[in-house]
Amino acid sequence: MPEPHAVLYVTNELSHIVKNGFLPIWKLTGDESLNDLWLENGKYATDVYAYGDVSKWTIRQLRGHGFIFISTHKNVQLADIIKTVDVRIPREVARSHDMKAFENEIGRRRIRMRKGFGDALRNYAFKMAIEFHGSEAETLNDANPRLHKVYGMPEIPPLYMEYAEIGARFDDEPTDEKLVSMLDYIVYSAEEVHYVGCGDLRTLMQFKKRSPGRFRRVLWHVYDPIAPECSDPNVIVHNIMVDSKKDILKYMNFLKRVERLFIWDVSSDRSQMNDHEWETTRFAEDRLGEEIAYEMGGAFSSALIKHRIPNSKDEYHCISTYLFPQPGADADMYELRNFMRLRGYSHVDRHMHPDASVTKVVSRDVRKMVELYHGRDRGTFLKKRLFEHLHIVRKNGLLHESDEPRADLFYLTNRCNMGLEPSIYEVMKKSVIATAWVGRAPLYDYDDFALPRSTVMLNGSYRDISILDGNGAILYLMWRYPDIVKKDLTYDPAWAMNFAVSLKEPIPDPPVPDISLCRFIGLRVESSVLRVRNPTLHETADELKRMGLDLSGHLYVTLMSGAYVTDLFWWFNIILDWSAQNKEQKLRDLKRSAAEVIEWKEQMAERPWHVRNDLIRALREYKRKMGMREGASIDSWLELLRHL
């Protein structure tokens, strides 16, 4: 059966280009009715180019159809908003008539648009959940470490510990300058940072520009004789040399219970020193930083110390939890960073990291780390792994038990969880918001397996849990939480439809057929495909109609095709409560709820769309055809319908 497709809507100045392509083209006149649009879009089984007048439709209606807006201009006028285009085509590409360049531009942008979908779900989760499972750097970037508990199973970065493997080289990409990268991966939950050897503050100001939120929530004590004055109220400059813990302690207020981080990046000038003197000085500076941090271990949660590898020693000792390479460092820079887990208060539970202790270092092994991981053309993924490893609490969300509200985004259907489907459904039942991959098209960028859509619907829908596809979830949040998900959000609705999303949300009251639930693009085509491939699948429905009875074709085809994810509790309440009203009452409820639809049959406006027995017959027929293969209980839904 066809998978979700996108409608690639181009403004008129691009319509001549798409005519040179191989995707179908859909011309919109602006005179189409709701049902015309629904029926016509349903005929396409691939992404389709569209152009013409869409000004009478709202953003939610068009997103419901899978529209992505493409133009050389900034905006497109819709019925309710002026929409910022999703894909801005450079004018030189438009003038060139180069179809490959045009489609590459769309494809590259669509990959980036996936982030908009994930960010929107995370924004909702940040409002509703305390615990975050399956987390990566994207969650850390926006989490509040004083409120949120961030769990996951991130990839472990290259680390040096006694008797441990360093790890293998991996592909990487360029990143920020070395010291900016250092602040980027080490600063997360600390509220007070004591940064010794801060230099002229350029690094700190670059970090402020890169991550203003994290910069602002820290009180910075910076120590360096050359540090200039700073106008930022959260930066306190100390123009001193730090020789002992006393130089730091006098600036600490122990009446405040805060998480503190110690950074030591001290390097004196070489001046007239020979090689031996210079190496001895550097070695002593690094050890002094470790000693000061260790002596103040009760005041700091952790420390990050400069660590230069000596040329003249085959082995040496330092105080360390881990040594690791530096993202963005030059390939010939034989300097690591030394992370020390200390005993001070922390918002993040870092008990899985060993306490800092005296460690023997084999010089050839740590030099190998430099050779494997340093270089100006590397650092992005190293930095990400360090950030995740230091600040994400290592826990498997499928096994974790807690009473805290939790979010489970983008990990449940990782291939490592294959065979654990019962646990996945249990998590979706408990979670404030959870996602699972249901797309059947080849997946090139992620290592996920697909859950059957019909099983997800039958297993995932409860009175207080709504199950929708990812596009439906975004449309629902636009409708019910417009302060969290704005109408102008840029995302790829076709990509979103490859996910099932469970939300701890009750059925809307009244239970209106909003776009977020009722889209069923291509349902008529799905029904025809079933008939022309295997007419026995429709025999019971045909016979019932000859007898003057009925079953819900929408429900039956939805389940049989495996092409849709939608909430059954909400759907059944629509049929039994909302659709039982007359036209005036139906329209009143839609208006009062500010709901929108993309399918409307005028001939059914005054009548119920179906009755209880139609739904029961559809479920029974699905059970008769697929019951032996369906992993979810159908009988429980039949029993519920009898009493709903």
Swiss-Prot record:
Location in or out of the cell: Virion
Keywords from the UniProt entry: Capsid protein, Outer capsid protein, Virion
Keyword NAD: no
The keyword Lyase is annotated on this UniProt entry: no
Entry superkingdom: Viruses
UniProt GO cellular component terms: viral outer capsid
Predominant localisation class: virion
Family: Belongs to the orbivirus VP4 family.
Role this protein plays: The VP4 protein is one of the five proteins (with VP1, VP3, VP6 and VP7) which form the inner capsid of the virus.
Protein name (record): Core protein VP4
Species of the source: Bluetongue virus 13 (isolate USA) (BTV 13)
The gene coding this protein: Segment-4
